Swiss-Prot record:
Subcellular location: Cytoplasm
NCBIfam families found in the cross-reference section: D_ala_D_alaTIGR, PRK01372.1
Pfam families assigned to the protein according to its UniProt record, in alphabetical order: Dala_Dala_lig_C, Dala_Dala_lig_N
Keyword S-adenosyl-L-methionine among UniProt keywords: no
Active-site residues, as the UniProt record annotates them: 15, 150, 281
E.C. designation(s): 6.3.2.4
Protein name (Swiss-Prot/TrEMBL): D-alanine--D-alanine ligase B
HAMAP family per the UniProt record, alphabetical: Dala_Dala_lig
Binding site for Mg(2+) 1: 257, 270
Chemical reaction(s) catalysed: 2 D-alanine + ATP = D-alanyl-D-alanine + ADP + phosphate + H(+)
Protein family according to the UniProt entry: Belongs to the D-alanine--D-alanine ligase family.
Record's subunit section: Monomer.
Length: 306
């Protein structure tokens, strides 16, 4: 008798719409691979009842809070249900850009200079020291919520007088916000599948940076896989990504986003432990380059669930 698989999709985070698309694609791919899979939306179904509903395994196609941040993973562990992707701690750390950066920095891995602010600090007014630290980053900077995905709440700030509005927007989505030095080179993403590192993808957005619209709505964003790196650069990138992945304790599948700055140095941006699986998504693109169909990819991700 084959396992009955729940594909968790939708949910209640800011990335609900993306997750619905991801989940629908995953569901179709699993069924194509002969898997007995069913959609479950935590917004509409009590996921504490998954076991009593007869499910033996869970494919997490949720993005953002409540699906990618360790809370759901902890619940599934208490229920004794195997699930795809990283465990509780690695999921929580990867969702938190600030703590990811602190860990990577502590491990000697390259990250862009940044300043972190809390909502309380912002509301009471920034100190001279904080203002000096922000000023030292130069312009432009990227302002982003620490625990939000899909570039939700993110802004590029090119003038000092635009910083307050960018911070206000970011603080609508989180209690902690990062202000990062702008890196001028191309962005890459590298997918990991079990023990295998897939070919890197180079991202060329039509606008000034890879925001929500460029990720999910624009047909003008260009993706290159292979990424066009020299063999030695690709090897360096893969080695960096593997170190970043293991430092956070990630497993199963996911991807890590990286920038190549004008100085020729790769800088780690963030880890994604439940990446998008839509028509614009990058893990399926990398898997295709490695000779794997979408259906084979999702079946393999499910096989890695524990």
């Amino acid at each position: 008798m084959t396992d009955k698989i729940a594909v968790l999709l939708g949910g209640t985070s800011a990335e609900r719409e993306v997750s619905l698309n991801s989940g629908a694609a995953v569901l179709a791919g699993l069924r194509e691979g002969g898997i007995d899979a069913y959609p479950v939306d935590p917004k509409e179904v009590d996921v504490t009842q998954l076991k009593s509903m007869g499910f033996q395994k869970v494919f997490i196609a949720l993005h953002g809070r409540g699906g990618e941040d360790g809370t759901l993973q902890g619940m599934l562990e208490l229920m004794g249900l195997p699930y795809t992707g990283s465990g509780v701690m690695a999921s929580a750390l990867s969702m938190d850009k600030l703590r990811s950066k602190l860990l990577w920095q502590g491990a000697g891995l390259p990250v862009a200079p940044w300043v972190a602010l809390t909502r309380v600090e912002f509301e009471k007014g920034l100190s001279d020291k904080q203002l000096a630290e922000i000023s030292a980053l130069g312009l432009p900077v990227i302002v982003k919520p620490s625990r939000e995905g899909s570039s939700v709440g993110m802004s590029k700030v090119v003038a000092e007088n635009a910083l307050q509005d960018a911070l206000r927007l970011a603080f609508q989505h989180d209690e902690e916000v990062l202000i990062e030095k702008w890196l001028s080179g191309p962005e890459f993403t590298v997918a990991i599948l079990g023990e295998e590192i897939l070919p890197s993808v180079r991202i060329q957005p039509s606008g000034t940076f890879y925001d929500y619209e460029a990720k999910y709505l624009s047909d003008e964003t260009q993706y290159f896989c292979p990424a066009g790196l020299e063999a030695s650069q690709e090897a360096n990138l893969q080695a960096l990504v593997l170190k970043a992945w293991t430092t956070l304790g990630c497993k199963g599948w996911g991807r890590i986003d990286v920038m190549l700055d004008s100085d020729g140095q790769f800088y780690l941006l963030e880890a994604n432990t439940s990446p998008g699986m839509t028509s614009h998504s990058l893990v399926p693109m990398a898997a295709r380059q490695a000779g794997m169909s979408f259906s084979q990819l999702v079946v393999r991700i499910l096989e890695l669930a524990d």
